[in-house]
UniProtKB/Swiss-Prot annotation:
Name used for this protein in its record: Small integral membrane protein 5
UniProt key word Cell cycle: no
Organism classification: Eukaryota, Metazoa, Chordata, Craniata, Vertebrata
Domain of life, source organism: Eukaryota
Disulfide bonds: none
Originating gene: SMIM5
Record localization: Membrane
Length: 77
């Protein structure tokens, strides 16, 4: 039941976004700037999330290869 509520909520958000985009050419400059800032912020957050996930997956899946261990021999006195 929670999944259907989530899908309906996402659909409603998408419809509101589409309505905003359709009304954007007639909007006032302040509304255009505010909408652009919100879109830019959302895109930045998604990009940073993508970069963080890719860096994490790279370190988890492909651990750094270390060189061969060299045994240290004691020096004679």
């Amino acid at each position: 039941m929670a999944a259907t509520d989530f899908v309906q909520e996402m659909r409603a958000v998408g419809e509101r976004l589409l309505l905003k985009l359709q009304r954007l050419p007639q909007a006032e400059p302040v509304e255009i700037v505010a909408f652009s800032v919100i879109i830019l912020f959302t895109a930045t957050v998604l990009l940073l999330l993508l970069i963080a996930c890719s860096c994490c997956c790279t370190h988890c899946c492909c651990p750094e290869r270390r060189g061969r261990k060299v045994q240290v021999q004691p020096t004679p006195p």
